[in-house]
């Protein structure tokens, strides 16, 4: 999924060069608009000192997509039409909520892998 915001590792490289007297990566950079970026762009940005990447759009989509899939697959059970009661198993939030949580969890795992943070800790 591509968003309207694109990362520009070249800009990050130029910013990092401004502080070369302070070391190779003189600034901790935040990657705003990281959702939809290519893995190569993410990795290149990390090499220039990015320590945080915002993926709000990706995580919102990862949470919402399974809910919509569930609603479409269980359309007749989710809706109460013309006085019918529907199917409680279809519209119970515990059913579609688990799917949403699993979608979010999978996206967070992917983000950790993309950002090279899997298996690391801040408190070494």
Name these PLM-found stretches:
Residues 27-33, 51-55:
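Hydrophobic faces of well-ordered beta-strands that scaffold small-molecule active sites
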Residues 1-29:
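Alpha-helix-loop-beta-strand connector modules within alpha/beta enzyme cores
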Residues 34-48:
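Catalytic cores of alpha/beta
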Residues 67-71:
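Short low-complexity, flexible loop/linker segments enriched in glycine and/or proline
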Residues 8-12, 42, 108-112:
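Generic structural signal for well-ordered alpha-helices
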Residues 33-37, 57-60:
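Glycine-rich beta-alpha junction loops
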Residues 48-66:
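Glycine-rich phosphate-binding active-site loops on the catalytic face of alpha/beta enzymes
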Residues 72-124:
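Extended, intrinsically disordered, low-complexity segments
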């Amino acid at each position: 999924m591509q968003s309207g915001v694109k990362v520009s590792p070249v800009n990050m490289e130029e910013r990092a060069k401004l502080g070369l007297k302070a070391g190779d990566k003189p600034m901790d950079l935040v990657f705003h608009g990281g959702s939809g970026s290519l893995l190569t762009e993410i990795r290149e940005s990390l090499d220039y000192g990015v320590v945080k990447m915002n993926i709000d759009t990706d995580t919102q989509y990862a949470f919402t997509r399974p809910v919509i899939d569930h609603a479409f697959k269980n359309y007749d059970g989710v809706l109460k039409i013309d006085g019918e009661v529907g199917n409680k198993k279809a519209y119970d939030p515990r059913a579609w909520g688990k799917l949403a949580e699993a979608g979010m969890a999978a996206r967070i795992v992917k983000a950790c892998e993309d950002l090279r943070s899997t298996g690391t800790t801040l408190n070494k």
